[in-house]
């Protein structure tokens, strides 16, 4: 249940959230919209219509639109007389609207001739209210016509009509071609600050500046601003943000200036035009003052707010956060106020961002395609959010728990009370000298009753296993050696064989790897925890003794240390530790009741622990080191070891999914289910991240080949993976300093080593979803240190991904003309961040290929 501190923090953070939304949406008082403006750019296409496919509105639909604008404007500007759009002029006259009549000029001269002939005809039939004529819209800007061709068209039209004639082009075209001016009756100029990346706060001044620039250059020509406006949605162009609030601000401010200065202008535009998305992207659809349903998009007279109706959005955000915190605080009795506050901050930030993300995406006109893309992106974003919340929860519990609620407790026992222990040491093709050290350490255990069973399975070379057999005979009756060949089931098969050979009086089974040298008090200190009859497992940490050998092993040591001093501690709070196949003790009765070690799973230790939990038994984790083994000698073995762990995790999830989700009866608690799912989420995220990278590369290649039609992904969705990466980095550095007592160098080394395994884990995750069995891989001991080139070759897949991502980034800046836009830069940053794990793999492989690089460069952790 949520205690009073949790409730107080929830409500306080809720209040701060409301305040934040209120500050962001503080009303801006802007000049009121005039009763009647001078003119609208008029394209009456509806949602399903596009002139690009010859789909035009009916005469009745055009008349409805003109009736809506009557009284709102004095005039409308048209762009073509094609099809029913030639009826705009007569229909406008019926609504007392003047017309600036336009003809569309393209590269097709036959079509241009027909368009001009119809333009002249429409003008002559409606000359009483057609006040100006435009021949061509940005034909020079597009490169469809030359200056000489446009002059010929102007001469042709001016010869047959008596209204003022011009062509419509942006301001720079008029300055670039002064020879045009003497062939027009007025200058029809487009001044659109958004396309030029001008901040909305400077946009009106920019329009005035360009207007005055033209006025100075051509003092004898009247200037008509044929297009001026701001889109309500679209890509951010330098300082120009396309938002509804910015559209309202710009237009209301401009209209006030235009009225004061006496400008002749046409607002771009009356209605949103969905068909323009193909030409101009999302911004092209959103220039209208009215939306597709012919409703005003913003307030004309009242103050402007950034997000109209934000009160409802903040209510949704707070409601979602309260539900989220009710779950996160459900089992957090020992969490300090700082931890609760941190979780509340993260929860409110995430829900606020999620609500804003959905609202922002929904502002666009959703087609079936954009809706499908949005759903896929939202599902991906939801996955990132879940991982981020799980990471935040672990950080809070690791940093701010008081005190630990589930500390291990043992009852001192006399020698007579201590149960017999059977120590099992599985081995396959292990160096005999190393094995002798392991056995010598076991021989001096300070424990009254124990036996040691060494099971060598499937080693072919007798010179490897016979010295171990002889040494067991020398150590006496407590040591028994078994060489079995063939023996199925890998390590689990060997352990099950040992269980069959175990002394009937043994109550506890202890397992260590063949390279571990244990301390004499290992069993004496650990076995008393079984005085609790519910205790099924007592687990110690994995630890290593060769961290000082070189820099590579020092990095590996730092990476291993994090889980055993952070993750296992927090999992122990809810009786949800991961059992490891070394330094572990299991109650024999429990081991036999659950069916022994699972020979189907290559991570038989973790799978056994989960089965024991499913039967309702307890486990405890003792963070003190009682034995040390050997780490992988090179990067290839480091990767293979982690591949096996990650692959086994997927198999366990698949095999036990029904129990973990509560779909079949078991005695798993909610906390255990949470930790087993949430604990493997980061690995699952690595798998999805690989799929994301492949998709990102494919999308970027499409952006390079079809730059005009394939935009970069929405910035909102790009921000989430960036946020997760930064959060995980900060979390790792913070907890390593706080819980592992690592230096900054050691923390960074641990992070680098962990990142270097991301691709390996991703491959293991994806492989685990499509296969059910893969061969067991033992971690070699005293393997040859890889030469540098060989070590780098072990990271060849990562190198290919790094090169692909790097080339994608370079391509964006070399190929795309819009590479200076915010979304391109953000997407490039995403690609760069996605490349960091691959770069980390190359760096770790490089370090692993230099076995003489001293450990002091990292700082060995003892």
Residue ranges and their predicted role:
Residues 419-422, 451, 592, 607:
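Cell-envelope/extracellular polymer assembly enzymes that use nucleotide-activated donors
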Residues 439-449:
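Short, acidic, metal-binding catalytic loop of nucleotide-sugar glycosyltransferases
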Residues 512-517, 600:
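The conserved acidic donor/metal-binding loop of glycosyltransferases
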Residues 95, 101, 131, 169-210, ...:
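Aromatic- and acid-rich polysaccharide-binding/catalytic face
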Residues 31, 47, 51-54, 236-244, ...:
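Aromatic-rich peripheral "rim/lid" segments of glycoside hydrolase catalytic domains that contact
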Residues 448, 456-468, 485-488:
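A conserved acidic beta->alpha catalytic loop
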Residues 470-507, 520-602, 607, 611-614, ...:
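Long helical/loop segments within the catalytic core of UDP-sugar-dependent glycosyltransferases
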Residues 334-386, 413, 682-775, 791-862:
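Membrane-embedded multi-pass helical conduit in multi-pass membrane proteins
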């Amino acid at each position: 249940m949520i205690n009073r501190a949790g409730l107080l923090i929830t409500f306080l953070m809720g209040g701060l959230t409301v305040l934040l939304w209120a500050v962001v949406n503080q009303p801006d008082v802007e000049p009121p919209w005039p009763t009647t403006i001078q003119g609208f750019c008029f394209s009456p296409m509806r949602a399903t219509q596009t002139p690009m496919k010859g789909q035009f509105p009916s005469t009745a639909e055009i008349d409805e639109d003109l009736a809506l604008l009557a009284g709102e404007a004095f005039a409308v500007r048209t762009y073509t007389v094609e099809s029913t759009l030639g009826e705009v002029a007569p229909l406008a006259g019926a609504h007392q609207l003047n017309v600036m009549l336009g003809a569309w000029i393209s590269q097709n001269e036959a079509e241009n001739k027909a368009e001009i002939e119809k333009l002249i005809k429409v003008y002559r039939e409606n000359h009483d209210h057609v006040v100006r004529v435009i021949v061509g819209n940005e034909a020079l800007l597009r490169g469809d016509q030359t200056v000489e061709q446009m002059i010929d068209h102007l001469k042709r039209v001016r010869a047959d009509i008596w209204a003022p004639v011009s062509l419509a082009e942006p301001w720079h075209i008029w300055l670039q071609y002064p020879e045009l001016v003497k062939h027009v009756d007025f200058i029809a100029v487009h001044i659109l600050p958004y396309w030029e990346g001008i901040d909305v706060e400077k946009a009106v001044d920019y329009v005035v500046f360009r207007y005055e620039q033209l006025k100075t250059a051509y003092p004898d020509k009247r200037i008509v601003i044929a297009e001026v406006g701001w889109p309500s949605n679209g890509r951010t162009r330098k300082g120009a943000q396309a938002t509804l609030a910015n559209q309202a601000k710009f237009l209301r401010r401009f209209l006030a200036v235009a009225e004061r200065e006496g400008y002749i202008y046409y607002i771009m535009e009356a209605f949103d035009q969905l068909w323009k998305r193909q030409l101009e992207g999302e911004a092209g659809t959103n220039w209208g003052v009215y939306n597709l349903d012919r409703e005003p998009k913003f307030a004309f007279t009242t103050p402007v707010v950034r997000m109209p109706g934000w009160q409802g959005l903040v209510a949704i955000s707070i409601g979602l956060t309260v539900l989220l915190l009710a779950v996160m605080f459900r089992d957090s009795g020992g969490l300090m106020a700082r931890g609760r506050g941190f979780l509340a901050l993260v929860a409110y930030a995430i829900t606020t961002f999620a609500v804003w993300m959905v609202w922002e995406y929904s502002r666009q006109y959703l087609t079936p395609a954009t809706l499908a893309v949005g759903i896929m992106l939202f599902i991906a974003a939801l996955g990132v959010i879940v991982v981020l919340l799980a990471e935040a929860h672990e950080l809070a519990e690791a940093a701010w728990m008081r005190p630990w609620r589930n500390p291990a407790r043992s009852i001192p026992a006399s020698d007579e009370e201590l149960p017999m222990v059977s120590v099992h040491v599985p081995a396959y093709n292990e160096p005999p000298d190393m094995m002798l050290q392991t056995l010598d350490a076991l021989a001096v255990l300070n424990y009254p009753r124990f036996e040691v069973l060494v099971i060598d399975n499937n080693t072919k070379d007798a010179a490897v296993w016979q010295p171990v057999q002889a040494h067991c005979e020398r150590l006496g009756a407590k040591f028994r050696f078994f060489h079995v060949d063939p023996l199925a089931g890998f390590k689990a098969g060997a352990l099950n064989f040992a269980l069959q050979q175990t002394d009937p009086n043994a109550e506890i089974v202890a397992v260590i790897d063949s390279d571990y040298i244990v301390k004499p008090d290992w069993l004496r200190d650990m076995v008393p925890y079984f005085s609790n009859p519910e205790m099924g497992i007592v687990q110690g940490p994995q630890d290593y003794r060769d961290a000082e050998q070189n820099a590579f092993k020092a990095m590996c040591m730092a990476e291993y240390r994090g889980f055993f001093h952070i993750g296992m501690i927090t999992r122990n709070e809810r009786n949800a530790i991961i059992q490891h196949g070394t330094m572990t003790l299991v109650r024999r009765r429990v081991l036999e009741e659950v069916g022994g070690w699972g020979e189907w799973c290559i991570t038989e230790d973790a799978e056994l622990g989960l089965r024991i939990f499913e039967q309702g038994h307890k486990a405890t984790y003792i963070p003190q080191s009682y034995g040390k083994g050997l780490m992988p000698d090179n990067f290839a073995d480091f990767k293979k070891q982690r591949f096996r762990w990650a692959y086994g995790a997927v198999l366990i999830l698949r095999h036990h999914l029904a129990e973990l989700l509560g779909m079949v009866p078991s005695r798993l608690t909610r906390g255990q289910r949470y930790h087993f799912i949430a604990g493997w989420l980061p690995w699952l995220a690595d798998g999805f991240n690989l799929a994301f990278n492949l998709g990102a590369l494919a999308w970027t290649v499409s952006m390079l080949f079809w730059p005009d039609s394939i935009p970069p992904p929405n910035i909102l969705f790009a921000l989430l993976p960036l946020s997760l990466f930064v959060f995980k980095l900060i979390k790792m550095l913070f907890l390593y300093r706080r819980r592992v007592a690592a230096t900054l160098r050691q923390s960074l080394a641990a992070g680098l080593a962990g990142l270097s395994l991301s691709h390996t884990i991703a491959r293991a995750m994806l492989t685990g979803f499509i296969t059910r069995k893969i061969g067991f891989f033992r971690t070699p001991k005293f393997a040859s240190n890889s030469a540098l080139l060989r070590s780098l070759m072990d990271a060849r897949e990562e190198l290919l991904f790094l090169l692909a991502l790097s080339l994608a980034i370079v391509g964006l800046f070399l190929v795309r003309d819009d590479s200076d836009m915010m979304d391109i830069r953000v997407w490039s940053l995403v690609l760069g961040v996605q490349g960091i794990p691959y770069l980390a793999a190359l760096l770790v492989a490089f370090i692993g290929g230099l076995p003489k690089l001293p450990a002091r460069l990292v700082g060995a952790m003892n």
